[in-house]
Amino acid sequence: MDLDSPMGMAPMMGTARTGATILCCNCGVPIDGTSSAGALCYDCIKSTVDISQGIQREGTLHFCRDCERWLMPPSTWVAAAPESRELLSLCLKRLRNLGRVRIIDARFVWTEPHSRRIKVKITIQDQVSDGVLMQQSFEVVYVVAYQQCRECAKSYTANVWRAVVQVRQKVTHKRTFLLLEQLILKHQAHKDTINIKEEKDGVDFFFAQRNQAEAFVHFLKSVVPITLKDSRHLISQDTHTGDKQYKFTYSAEIIPICRDDLVALPLKLAKQIGNIPPLCLCYRIGTAVYLLDPNTLHTAELSSDVYWRQPFRPLADATSMVEFIVMDIEATGIRKGKWVLAEVTVARASDLGVNDNVYFTRTHLGHLLHPGDSVMGYMLTGTNFNSDTFDAIENSRQYGSTIPDVVLVKKHYPNRRRNRRRNWKLKRLPKDEGELLPKATDQARMDDEYEAFLRDVEEDEELRATLALYKNTRKTKKPQQDADAMSIAETEDDDDGPKISMDELLDDFEDLDIQDDQ
């Protein structure tokens, strides 16, 4: 019998290899045996394996209601808005054993605002066995607990400050402090203060740290001319480590010369700062005292260092000004910046109808004054200043014959009402008045000074550019009678004072009624 020769069996090209199929040991579903993990299907793995085991599902967040910050243990307080990235990061950092898995997604789940609960839904991923990745989502509930931070606790407790800046100016008014207050508010220089206390000759600013007080002192040097003295007081000492605790005091004294003051410079100093005539006006206060000679329009700058080498008092301040009426005015053609030099004849307002005394002088207000206008100025004729510096100027051969009878300072608007309604407002610092409240006379004087400052803001465009003015959206009370409303309207129409355009004003977000519609 013939036998066939053996033939080799080769697999056919293009035939795919099939894997072994097994049944899930738990539910009996057919699965691929070559890629299965422990003979379990994916659904059984999800039901029997918990990759979030060991991760806490509840937590506590501490919130300070005063400064609206959250506690990041052990002692750091961070600012975070509701449902913000910062708050979500803080929530994830508070969970234990979260670092051993991979975070795929995390988001907030809406809760009632008054429930004091924050829910976060977290999606994680981890390797189970034999390269099988499993993804799982779960929710974590945080309870919001109220706790006062250290800074807020210090602000409500006396004598917890570490540094104080005492700002003083030895004058009879606080006009410079009103300007300084607005500059502080505009630049937010008071944000680190724990208390602001008003004193007789100035204001005290209290800080929790020394570097905050030093930063505030640097700000003062950039806006007003000051001289600085510092001291420290030992409050405690550790005998074992040698550590010492100090309280620091910075005394900043502002030059006692204010805007619109009449200044009599010592003759030597007048030559030193630009050979300006010694009798001049202070037209602006900045990092230095800026002086103007109204007879020639010459200007000079008196720095703080130069002043304190030879300090002197102003010859007269704004409380000594009297009202004059312009009888005649003629411009000379000399101009410097906004000022126009003019020759003017004025009469004292109190002398009208009593005598015929008139005074001839030069003024820098040629761009503002017209015959019949009212102007405020200083009366030099017949005035005893009791000043050795002024006596030296009178006896000087060079300047004795140039002393005018009258020095005009600024235009006056007699028809302007005192407490008229303005379309703008200024913010004020939250100051502690101390143990003793101001007397009625002192309060009236402070109101007069503030009203004068508001008028200066209305009249001086350069001054307004350095301040932050806000729209006055406060609703006024409805008059009880129509006659009262008519009288108020007529008075405002007759008001000849300068007004501020709405384009120069900012919106005050504290007065806006913002509602979140959800």
Curated annotation (Swiss-Prot):
GO cellular component terms listed in the entry, alphabetical order: cytoplasm; nucleoplasm
Motif, Nuclear localization signal: chain positions: 410-427
Chain ranges for the short sequence motif Nuclear export signal as given in the UniProt record: 502-511
Superkingdom of the organism of origin: Eukaryota
Location of region: Disordered: 473-518
One Pfam family per UniProt: NMD3_OB
GO molecular function: ribosomal large subunit binding
Protein's cellular compartments: Cytoplasm; Nucleus, Nucleoplasm
Biological process terms in GO annotation: protein transport; ribosomal large subunit export from nucleus
Transport among keywords: yes
InterPro entries xref list: Nmd3, Nmd3_N, NMD3_OB, NMD_SH3
Compositionally biased intervals (Acidic residues): 504-518
Keyword tags: Coiled coil, Cytoplasm, Nucleus, Protein transport, Transport
Family: Belongs to the NMD3 family.
The protein's assembly and partners: Associates with the 60S ribosomal subunit.
Record function comment: Acts as an adapter for the XPO1/CRM1-mediated export of the 60S ribosomal subunit.
Name of the featured protein: 60S ribosomal export protein NMD3
